[in-house]
Curated annotation (Swiss-Prot):
Binding site for ATP: G16, P17, M18, F19, S20, G21, K22, S23, D89, E90, I91, Q92
Superkingdom classification of source: Bacteria
Keywords carried by this UniProt record: ATP-binding, Cytoplasm, DNA synthesis, Kinase, Metal-binding, Nucleotide-binding, Transferase, Zinc
Localization per Swiss-Prot or TrEMBL: Cytoplasm
Protein name per the record: Thymidine kinase
Reactions it catalyzes: thymidine + ATP = dTMP + ADP + H(+)
Length: 193
């Protein structure tokens, strides 16, 4: 993790599978910035309404207020001039215009902290996340614990009716009754049809 001066913007990214503590780490960094009396704005995609529309919420229940946006460009529209730290959760749900938005905010001299899944349920790069990682000064890849064997988990297993989702299933399911588990490379299953 990098801490620059207030006149030097930079980008931090927190990635990993579900249940690895990404949102929890994002919230921790936001709270530290607030303790340091820095003005923080937090954004999240409107599609992420699992726990709350106007909060970033971790699986352990920690939460922090957030502004819900439907597209990346809204972040620039809502960004206040005196904001020093911008946090964006669930970056994988944004389109690729987020790359330019994040770059522009950092070029304004602001600290940008992004969090999201680096791989989809197939174990493949997820959305805009790899491109944000490429332009970041700092990337932290977190792991969870594999529910099958207990080893470090780097993947998210999607289960539908208790069975691994198939490779051809949609990447993003909104409002579906799927469940997810953290899995290691060996235990991660994605059947091809």
């Amino acid at each position: 993790m990098i801490y620059g001066s207030l006149d030097h913007g930079f980008i931090e990214v927190i990635v990993g599978p579900m249940f690895s503590g990404k949102s929890e780490e994002l919230i921790r960094r936001i709270r530290r910035a607030q303790i340091a009396k820095q003005k923080v704005q937090v954004f999240k995609p409107a599609i992420d309404d699992r726990y709350s529309i106007d909060k970033v919420v971790s699986h352990n229940g920690s939460s922090i207020n957030a502004i819900s946006v439907t597209k990346a460009s809204e972040i620039l529209d809502l960004l206040e001039e005196d904001t020093q730290v911008v946090a964006i959760d669930e970056i994988q749900f944004f389109d690729h215009s987020l790359v330019d938005v994040v770059r522009e905010i950092a070029d304004m001299g602001k600290r940008v902290i992004c969090a999201g899944l680096d791989m989809d349920f197939r174990g493949e790069p997820f959305g805009v996340t790899p491109d944000i990682m490429a332009i970041a000064e700092s990337v932290d890849k977190l792991t969870a614990i594999c529910v099958k064997c207990g080893n470090p988990a780097t993947r998210t297993q999607r289960l539908i009716n208790g069975k691994p989702a198939k490779y051809d299933d949609p990447i993003i399911l909104v409002g579906a009754h799927e469940t997810y588990e953290a899995r290691c490379r060996k235990c991660h299953e994605v059947p091809r049809t």
